[in-house]
Amino acid sequence: MRSINQLLKQASLSQKSQYNFSQTNLKKVIAEIIPQKQAELKEVKEKYGDKVVGQYTVKQVIGGMRGMKGLMSDLSRCDPYQGIIFRGYTIPQLKEFLPKADPKAADQANQEPLPEGIFWLLMTGQLPTHAQVDALKHEWQNRGTVNQDCVNFILNLPKDLHSMTMLSMALLYLQKDSKFAKLYDEGKISKKDYWEPFYEDSMDLIAKIPRVAAIIYRHKYRDSKLIDSDSKLDWAGNYAHMMGFEQHVVKECIRGYLSIHCDHEGGNVSAHTTHLVGSALSDPYLSYSAGVNGLAGPLHGLANQEVLKWLLQFIEEKGTKVSDKDIEDYVDHVISSGRVVPGYGHAVLRDTDPRFHHQVDFSKFHLKDDQMIKLLHQCADVIPKKLLTYKKIANPYPNVDCHSGVLLYSLGLTEYQYYTVVFAVSRALGCMANLIWSRAFGLPIERPGSADLKWFHDKYRE
């Protein structure tokens, strides 16, 4: 097995970059990499600028542009069979090679990757050392204080507001502290330097969002009794602590959850919305508030709670100890009534989501006796084979949402309307990394064309 240092050196050589493994200041590392990536982008435009990317149909234009390559995101891509690949690394590789909360522990109870590590990877393209992750952890701790005026703003929000509405509003409230907005308004920043205040705002937002999200949780579900931050904990572990979860298993779960949900190409609703709004030079607070609003949509961020509700309904009707035939019959009933079985199938993947496997491994070790988890795993074995018997269902494999909500529920986070906030805390990593690189690349405002129905008739009528 290759050591992490061997992997780091190989990654550096393969990308032909002069990477300083002793440098723990992320901004300085990025500043060194930006000219190389700008040169690479220039080369791509000069060499391939007139090449045809692909053809697309009227059906794709009307159908949400699915499958059309219309964006550039250098952070991750989704392979139909390997799942999400972050800067060249798969989910299993990230679990193996990214630093953990306890670097000395070799047991399976301490094997979830730290989100600090995956953010470093997204920003630099390089696997970080423990020292680099530790430096980033301390930087986020130093930036993570939420001023009392913002705390009061959240605590004065009506508790019947959806938690995602609260999060979006809190991000907009924090926008008054945007460094980019201030510099741009004063005319003190040039285009080539946009990335620097975007970096500062993005790092502040990432540092503060676990605190903001925890305040929302305690306000809405725990009588507004807040828990102070713990400076000894990492970004994800501290988030769990501030929500009120002190068990090691919950902290480990949140570390893994925030890592594997952090990015998913550039075309999903939250990432695309953040990029689109940011392309107008809206600062990171404005941009990610918009992305959060997209994530709140039932078709994007609510899938995991739909799976949980489906499974709870199944348990209410059938119990947890059932036969495979009981599951098959229930699926038949669901499909015949015109509904879908949530948690199965994916827009891109054509095999079981590696993020699902990641959570299965976690729960088999930490929650091996949990009856709901056992039932979920039984369903994941039975349902895909059953769905394949329906001619219109070609992709029946479990996705990440099949497991994530049930996992949180089994660990005691039972307020499922809050789950999308946890998702939003994670997705801030990818969205902010994309924003910083969009400004570093000098990408323009996004402005596709559109067509009315008459245009289609006039163009294609025989």
Swiss-Prot record:
The active site is at H300, H346, D401. It is found in: Mitochondrion matrix; Cytoplasm; Cytoplasm, Cytoskeleton. Residues 1-21 form a transit peptide. Pathway: Carbohydrate metabolism; tricarboxylic acid cycle; isocitrate from oxaloacetate: step 1/2. It holds the Pfam family Citrate_synt. Its EC number is 2.3.3.16. Its main location: mitochondrion. Homodimer. NCBIfam families: PRK09569.1 (NF007128). This is Citrate synthase, mitochondrial. The lineage of its organism: Eukaryota, Sar, Alveolata, Ciliophora, Intramacronucleata.
